Each structure stands twice: as C-alpha cells, then as structure tokens.
Amino acid sequence: MSIDFGLSEEQLALRELAHDFSKNEIRPVAAHHDETGEYPWGVLAKAHELGLLNTHIAPENGGLGLGAMDGMVIAEELAWGCSGIGTAMEANGLAEQPVILGGSESLKARYLSPMTESGRERPIMCAYAVTEPGAGSDVQGLKTTAVKKGDKWVINGTKMWITNAGVADWYFVVAVTDPAKLARGGMTAFIVEKGWAGVHVGKKEYNMGQRCSDTRGLTFEDVEVPEENIVGQIGDGWKLAMAAFDYTRPAVSCAAIGVARAALEHAAQYATERKTFGQPIANHQAIQFMLADMAMEIDAGRLLCWKAAWMKDAGLRNTKEAAMAKAFCADVVMKTTTNAVQVYGGYGYSEEYPVEKLMRDAKIFQIYEGTSQIQRMIIAREMLSRGK
C-alpha cells in the first residue's frame, strides 16, 4: 500500500487559483467587510465566474464535480484570505450536499443546475436551515413541523443561526413529520424557496467575528411545499442532514487551518521585525517555542483534514475522522490566533493589526457545524460502537 502526501497537478492548480484569488480579491477588502458587515457580493460574483463556487455539483448539472480532497485545498486558501468571506462562499455547499446525496434528478435539475450558470447578475445562493432556538447540537429536538394536507406539505416553525439566510434563494429545511419517530425516520427534508408565502427572514445578527457572513433566523408560517420538493424519501431528513457533515466538516476544518496559517505567517513576520533587548523577539526561545507549536499543530491538523477527505473520496465511512479533524483544527485555530496576538503584545490587541480579527474569526470554528464537545462525543461513539 503506497502513501502519497503530495497533491495532483490538478489540485496544485486549484490551490494556486484559490490562493491568487484570496490574495488579489479577498484580502484587499477583508477589513472593509469586517467593519461594515456588508455581504461580499462583488467577491462572490468574481469567484462564481472563476468556478470557485458550487464546486461539488456534478457535471451533469453544470458543475465541476470536484471531490472532497479538491475542496480541502480551496477551503484553506479562501479562509487564509478571510474566513468570513470564505464562509459566505462555502456555505452553499452544506445546503447543496444533501440534495446531491438524496435529491431526485428532477430536484437537482431545478435547484442545482441554475447555481452553476454564468452570466447572472449575482450567483444563486442557498442555506442549510436545520438549527432552531432550542435545538442546536440536539438536532433530535427540532420543533419545526411539516403536515401533509392534500398534495402539499405545510411547514410551521422557526430556525436560528442560519448562514446565508438573508441572501439565499432556497433553503434545505428539515422538519418533523412523525413526532413518534423523530430521528428514526420521523424527520423529512424539503427544499423551500425564499419567495414563497409564509417564509419570513429575520434581522442580520452582528457577531464577534466573520461579520460579513449573513446569519439570521427564519420563520415558516403555514408554508406550502409541493410533494416533489421532498429531498430523498419521507423520513430521510435526519440521515441526509447528518450525512452532509461527513463532506463539509473536513472542509470547515481545512478553513480553520487557513486562518491559523495566516496567523502564523503574521506572527512569524512580526517576530523577525520587532526588537527587544537589542535583538528581534524571534531570537528569544519563548517566542520560538510558540511559533514552533503553531507550525506543528497546523501541519497535524491539515493531515487530519486530508485523511478525512481522502476516506470520503475512497468511498469509506469517515464520520469519526471528520469529527477528529473538526475538533482538532477548531482548537488549533483558536490557540494559534490567540498566541499570534500574544506575539504581537499590545499591538496585537489593536485593530490596526490583522491578528485581532483572526482571533475573533477563529472562535466560531469551535461552534458551527457541531461544537468541539459534540465532535468528541461523536469520536467516542464511533470508537466504542465499532471497537476501533
């Protein structure tokens, strides 16, 4: 059995494309979008024309059909530029993935194919609408319901912390269709369009970090959804919602590595320029150890991401490995950005320097797509249930 830690020529080209895009299009406007919270439509439009959006949609629906490993190299570079803008760009993938996995060909043609079309005034966006005010980590506690009435399903309920909610054209929604079963076949997934009667979009949340990412609540009030907008089969909602994470958690983890890498680069450069006691602080062992720890943990995290992605591309179950990558990389980015601020000292606490933004942006990685504590529960469950 051979092991290859290198990227293919195609993946190297993807990484170069994404890195150059981040350097030239994302980083120059990152501070503006952080300060204003303005959604980065201009950046997204350019990314869409380059093919950096919706990369996992299959060729038969107009996409590139990229694999999980391909997505890793793109996600890291986009987040290296700005994780807030990167999240705005990558959020489509979480809503698309359940449709890719379980949607009918008709559903894919209606909702995925238009997302790959060029020449639009703005890209079509979508959002994964599962979390609720009382059901975050505990997805089995969902209260949103869908009741069959005639040839339609009527949805009522509230969703919370939905990324892209205000800009999305459609939502992947999970609702309870059989309260007696819940996660064991009692939840069903639907595609709900933003413009339908009864869909109400809440106010934008102004968060600690990743401020240009559009996060809002959604309320569904007697929203009528046609039968053909069910994703998969009745009762597949929980399964599809969770299956998507095996694809997206490695990418989110690699995005965390992109932020950590940016923090390390800034800290290392500053350490060579800042002088104390007549020499650069990089000459002091205390600083060297901090930088060395950052570098070790970033490389270790990236390898966890790559393994989880490789397993998914190989058709192997990667739930445990995806959770390992997510938990480890989320903690790494929080530690790395915090230590980058420490290397800068008082300057690191100032908005005039880049590391305070990176530290604010980092925290959410320990929360969204499953908290670090939930990831550890998943890891333990997988280990104990499978005996390995």
Model-derived features: positions:
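Short glycine/proline-enriched turns and hinge-like loops at secondary-structure junctions
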Residues: L66-G67, D138-Q140, N164-D169, A183-G186, ...
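Hydrophobic, small-residue-rich alpha-helical packing segments that form membrane-like cores
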Residues: A135-D138, W153
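A short, Trp-centered hydrophobic/proline-enriched beta-strand micro-motif
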Residues: E121-T131
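Alpha-helical interface subdomain recognition
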Residues: M1-G81, I85, G102-L107, S118, ...
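N-terminal glycine-rich flavin-associated loop
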Residues: G86-S106, G136
